[in-house]
């Protein structure tokens, strides 16, 4: 019976690194072509990777069983499903919980596969990462500085496509540059790794996305801190994010009042709008402080007693633009604790890496958490798949080394 369930072994050795390399090569281009294409791309890559892994009769369950992330993921999905019983919109909550379950299932199946890739397979994925960044740089430069001809074509000849159409790709390249730079670093091409980061900075910073600029800047600072202080940097950035998430309810209103007095609304419209949303979220959090309002409640949150921001049709447009506050609002402090634990796991694992690998872990991790604060919603599938793709590519590229610090 067991033999029937095994995929046939052929003379040609399966290479599970190929689907990941293809995904890496398209990771920045896909968000430019399709707003939700990242979900399809990573799903297909994950499925093909697992099939090729099993085709070569490599073990899957032992590594999956020992996954630290799996335990936290199961607890988080279970809490999301439970929260649907008191959610404002149960159907929407169950749909979102199902999407989250599928995404995390794909991630936890592929994660043990990428940890067992051979050095040759890892180099192949690394080449895909570098190629993907170069393709992304070229495409973003053409669209960003050339009048957006590609976006105009995709929008059926629209002569003036909105600039924000590139924002998702800009954020994606700000994250995906880290595994690409790590690959070059591990090959001994450290100058090339630094040059690649500089090229991405030159493309991202002058463009429209403040979230991408913030993520890239914070990531570079964290990487430099890790270079100078070693493991201390991992502890420092991890504790700072936990402390910042827990202190947010006490900081939002003073910061909003300071912004109102000192920062011009026309120049800082986006920041004023986010702070206004966060103040509203904190008021609603205080009404259900322990269990939260239920998964996906942000989309249906009652806005009585508050004036709608000019140009908006509701207080929270899709999400609160702060993932920590969104999780706290919807899932309460227990949900927030699970998210923070899930974020700390990769930093804890990275303590055993070499100093160079720790440096790039710090950069990728800090860039991701920085983008979580002003950027996207916890329930946006494209963002969830982008973060999971980053984690998988980083782990696939990383070549185990002896700790040297």
Name these PLM-found stretches.
Residues 121-154, 161-227, 345:
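Alpha-helical transmembrane segments of multi-pass inner-membrane proteins
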Residues 138-141, 224-267, 282-287, 295:
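A membrane-periplasm/extracellular boundary helix in multi-pass inner-membrane enzymes
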Residues 45-50, 342, 361-373, 377-405:
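Transmembrane alpha-helices of multi-pass inner-membrane enzymes
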Residues 25-31, 77, 194-208, 220, ...:
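Membrane-interface alpha helices of multi-pass inner-membrane proteins
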Residues 265-279, 287, 291-331:
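Long extracytoplasmic/lumenal interhelical loops at the membrane interface
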Residues 330-368:
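Hydrophobic transmembrane alpha-helices and their immediate junctions
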Residues 69-76, 90-113, 124-128, 133, ...:
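Aromatic-anchored transmembrane helix interface
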Residues 1-92, 115-123, 127, 183-190, ...:
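Transmembrane signal-anchor hairpin modules in multi-pass inner-membrane enzymes, especially those
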